[in-house]
Amino acid sequence: MIQSFTRLAVADNSGAKELMCIKILGGSKRRYATVGDIIVCSVKKALPNGKIKRGQVVKAVVVRTKKELHRGNGSLIRFDENAAVVLDSKKELIGTRIFGPVGREVRYNGFMKIVSLAPEVL
């Protein structure tokens, strides 16, 4: 469950290390984002030679949340951290690698590139 001002780790090699959520896309009064949702973020920490610089505003898709995710079959899944993957303006990946597992809900929302690059889909 991601809301405004939530800090997220970055799960790709785009150069950003930490993001802060500014807005959740998809509805005027939408309060929370979960796995597979697109959010607008500010880059809080970045590598000095990365593609993304500190202070830049980017879009990202959430791939892991600490809050339990309720599946349709009754199962729950929970990750150790909140993490996202940085996107460009055309909603394509900036990085070329994904680190750590991602939730299956990313596939349902049409981000097949993330699913194919991820080492594990849970």
Swiss-Prot record:
Reported function: Binds to 23S rRNA. Forms part of two intersubunit bridges in the 70S ribosome.
Keywords recorded for this protein, A-Z: Ribonucleoprotein, Ribosomal protein, RNA-binding, rRNA-binding
Record field: transmembrane: none
Name of the protein this chain belongs to: Large ribosomal subunit protein uL14
Protein's UniProt keywords contain Iron: no
Encoding gene per record: rplN
UniProt-listed HAMAP family: Ribosomal_uL14
InterPro entries per record: Ribosomal_uL14 (IPR000218), Ribosomal_uL14_bac-type (IPR005745), Ribosomal_uL14_CS (IPR019972), Ribosomal_uL14_sf (IPR036853)
Example GO BP: translation
Quaternary structure (record): Part of the 50S ribosomal subunit. Forms a cluster with proteins L3 and L19. In the 70S ribosome, L14 and L19 interact and together make contacts with the 16S rRNA in bridges B5 and B8.
Stated family: Belongs to the universal ribosomal protein uL14 family.
GO terms assigned for molecular function: large ribosomal subunit rRNA binding; structural constituent of ribosome
GO CC annotations on file: cytosolic large ribosomal subunit
Source superkingdom: Bacteria
Protein's organism: Campylobacter hominis (strain ATCC BAA-381 / DSM 21671 / CCUG 45161 / LMG 19568 / NCTC 13146 / CH001A)
